[in-house]
Amino acid sequence: RDISFTGSGEMDNGMTISYFQLLSAGSFSSSGLTLDMGDAGSMTFMNGASGGHGISAYEDKMPTASEQAWDDLDGQANGVLTGNKTNKIGYGTSVAGANVSVDYNKQQDGGSGKSLAVDYAPMDGVMIFVAQSDEYAGVNTSMDQTTFGGTYTAGATTVGIQMTSIDKSAANADQDRTHIAASFAVNEDLSVSWGMSTVDFEGAAKKDQEDSGFGVSYTMGSMSLTAAFNSSDNVGGTS
């Protein structure tokens, strides 16, 4: 049901440009244009996609063999940051070994969204990251988002932790999420993973939403088979 169109080319100055457009279920889904300027970084012009820049690229960086522990559940949007992906401009580059990126979009209601993200590998097998965004879309519809965490890889095992805070201008709407996960490559074809996510809602009457899941993937040549087994308790803070 998905049809994608892609194209790329190199300009006379050595820079490369690439484009994609995705049609899903017979309608427009996303499109993007990327200008790779080499050592000067890259610029993206996206609609419906993150383009790898800004906070949208750090929605969830935890290791998994299939789906994240919170995915495909009734409360999957709870505690998960949502970067605005509508008609946005992004830029990314490398500074002193750190990958730095920003993005910005102007919204139709007069508001705007902008974000900054940084990730850094201080040593082999270790990656740490932090990202922050603010979005103004009118009274009681604005929010600030922050996420940070890290992963560590030793041999065939990768473990990670990520913490996300969503501060909404509406009353009693803030959410904080902690996600831990681990993956293990049994061999070059088979991988397994486990994850657990807890969402803390603002409001004394709400309980913590607890998500957990197990994933597995198996690759045979160019084909991959994946499966996820996820469960959730206290969805939306209600038992």
Task: Put a short name on every predicted segment.
Residues 1-239:
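Outer-membrane beta-barrel proteins
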